[in-house]
From Swiss-Prot:
Residues that coordinate or bind Fe cation: H227, D229, H282
The UniProt record lists the keyword Protein biosynthesis: no
Family the UniProt entry places it in: Belongs to the OGFOD2 family.
Protein name (Swiss-Prot/TrEMBL): 2-oxoglutarate and iron-dependent oxygenase domain-containing protein 2
Organism (species): Danio rerio
GO molecular function: dioxygenase activity; iron ion binding; L-ascorbic acid binding; oxidoreductase activity, acting on paired donors, with incorporation or reduction of molecular oxygen
EC number: 1.14.11.-
Superkingdom assignment: Eukaryota
Note accompanying the cofactor annotation: Binds 1 Fe(2+) ion per subunit.
Key words, A-Z: Dioxygenase, Iron, Metal-binding, Oxidoreductase, Vitamin C
Residue numbers binding 2-oxoglutarate: R292
UniProt cofactor(s): Fe(2+); L-ascorbate
Fe2OG dioxygenase domain sequence ranges: 207-301
Length: 345
């Protein structure tokens, strides 16, 4: 497998302060005070003790990121040793898991006459710009997968936080889903669609991913603040269980301020996936009852992100890592990132 890298901004940028619904950049305390102290005061962080508490949370998050590679590897090893799956079959993708309409679209995309206009006749277009809906899995598979995820959640095996904003969920590569499930799903069934729908933003050359499930519950995470993804294209599939409300809402692309954006709500439907551009700003409204599990696949195109990191908006400075990491690669001429450093652990 080709070597993948992380951008060094992972250790400084897009740190989410849940209490203030704010993403920040932290290089030093002096820089942070200069850039954010007045903003935080306007959001209710008025005292020095409150500010010091914010600094402490940021430093803890940076430490978590610095140790992420090591801790993830350790968790995966322990899970492999001590965890016994409930449904072993869900770890290996089979066409019988997939909805007929997805298989029909993939078949169409493989035909010589395939084009965007033809695919748009087979896929549902949402009111939000270039957001598409289609049934991904059969209900029986979603039921089995949810039972497996809940079985793992209730086990003594270690669990990692799925991302910097969700507190509850599962990182799927640590559980062993990447090679036999997520990778073939991306390569064989999703990339034919994204190649037509998102060719302008890397959809035709997706070569890595990060996949995780997130959980929303009345006693845990209820919603998700407005954000963009570390992906070129994202698939968000509602797996279940029983829930009310909690719709997604989409704004504009990340370059457009929220004040200039009109948001559009998009409903979650079990077994169905929503496909959208990673830089398309979005969030999740609060559920009002029940529990909802979502499968999220951040699909990445090194050819696209090697030019500009989607998280910091600059040419990436690479940090060595494991697996698919954040989807950056070294160009064949070595030019993509002359600055390559070892991960801080």
């Amino acid at each position: 497998m080709e070597r993948f890298y992380t951008c060094s901004c992972f250790f400084t940028d897009n740190i989410f302060l849940e209490e203030y619904k704010l993403h920040v950049r932290f290089v030093s305390e002096n820089q942070f005070r200069k850039d954010y102290q007045n903003i935080l005061r306007s959001l209710g962080c008025e005292s020095e003790s409150q500010f010091r508490d914010v600094i402490g949370k940021i430093q803890a998050e940076i430490e978590r990121r610095q140790n992420h590679k090591l801790k993830s590897t350790e968790r995966a090893a322990v899970i492999k040793e001590i965890y016994t799956p409930l449904h072993q079959h869900v770890y290996h993708l089979q066409e019988s898991f997939l909805a007929p309409e997805l298989l029909e679209m993939v078949k169409y995309c493989a035909s010589s006459e395939a084009n965007v206009q033809g695919l748009l006749k087979l896929i549902q277009t949402e009111a939000a710009s270039r957001v598409f809906r289609f049934q991904v899995f059969r209900k029986e598979f979603c039921k089995d997968l949810l039972e497996e995820l809940e079985h793992f959640e209730q086990s003594d095996a270690p669990k990692g936080r799925p991302n910097t904003m969700n507190n509850y969920g599962i990182v799927l590569n640590e559980l062993g889903f990447d090679e036999g499930f997520i990778t073939p799903l991306r390569e064989v069934y999703l990339r034919p669609l994204t190649a037509l729908l998102y060719s302008d933003c890397g959809g035709n050359c997706l070569d890595s991913h990060k996949a995780f499930v997130v959980k929303y519950d009345m006693h845990e995470d209820l919603n998700l603040s407005y954000h963009y993804d570390n992906s070129e294209v994202t698939l968000n599939v509602s797996l279940g269980k029983d829930f009310t409300e909690g719709n997604l809402f989409f704004g504009d692309m990340r370059q457009v301020p929220l004040s200039e954006t009109e948001c559009v709500e998009v409903e979650h439907r079990v077994t169905e996936g929503l496909l959208h551009r990673g830089q398309h700003m979005h969030g999740a409204l609060s559920i009002s009852s029940g529990t909802r599990w979502n499968l999220i696949i951040w699909m990445r195109a090194s050819r696209q992100r090697n030019k500009l990191c989607p998280m910091c908006g600059k040419r990436p400075t690479l940090v060595e890592s494991d697996g698919f990491s954040d989807g950056f690669t070294m160009d064949s001429d070595g030019d993509a990132r002359a600055n390559v450093s070892c991960s801080l652990t």
